[in-house]
């Protein structure tokens, strides 16, 4: 009987290991400069850096050109999408933490200007289309 207990104890010890999770996030050292989009406005002292392989090429080739959407239209979408994004960041067991890593500090009462709203809007469209996510009640379209 003692040998059964010892055997079970050894089996229990051997089975108590942590799972080896392999992260599918891109290695930041292997990302080219072309895949980094930097948006800065020195007047209100903010900076947005988007590090997403393929986004810059998508922005230049597929996204609607600047001026296509009004700033008001993009701000409305950005507010809704950022709220949902931040909600998902805070729920890593329900949503993939590799997709939703950091919160976006986007405050509706601040006028970020056209360029920031344009690039944030297009990144959120790109993100939803690339990763098949829906951040709002409507599908993003180009």
Predicted regions, residues:
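Positively charged n-region of N-terminal signal peptides that target proteins for export
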Residues: 1-5
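C-terminal motif of bacterial Sec signal peptides marking the signal peptidase cleavage site
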Residues: 12-15
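Bacterial signal peptide processing site
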Residues: 17-21
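Post-signal peptide N-terminal segment of mature Sec-exported envelope proteins
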Residues: 25-47
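Acidic/histidine-rich, surface-exposed loop or edge segments in extracytoplasmic proteins
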Residues: 57-71
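Extracytoplasmic/periplasmic, Sec-exported soluble proteins
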Residues: 70-77, 115
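Compact alpha-helical subdomains of small soluble proteins
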Residues: 88-142
């Amino acid at each position: 009987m003692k040998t059964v207990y010892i055997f079970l104890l050894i089996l229990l010890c051997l089975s108590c290991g942590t799972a080896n999770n392999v992260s599918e996030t891109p290695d930041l050292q292997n990302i080219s400069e072309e895949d980094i989009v930097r948006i800065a406005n020195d007047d209100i002292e903010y900076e947005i850096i988007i590090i997403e392989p393929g986004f810059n090429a998508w922005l230049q080739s597929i996204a609607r050109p600047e001026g296509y959407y009004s700033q008001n239209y993009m701000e409305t979408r950005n507010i809704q999408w950022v709220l949902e994004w931040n909600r998902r960041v805070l729920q890593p067991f329900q949503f993939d933490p590799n997709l939703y890593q950091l919160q976006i500090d986007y405050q509706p009462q601040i006028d970020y200007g056209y360029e920031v709203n344009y690039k944030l809007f297009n990144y959120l469209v790109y993100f939803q289309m690339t990763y098949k996510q829906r951040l709002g009640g409507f599908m993003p379209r180009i």
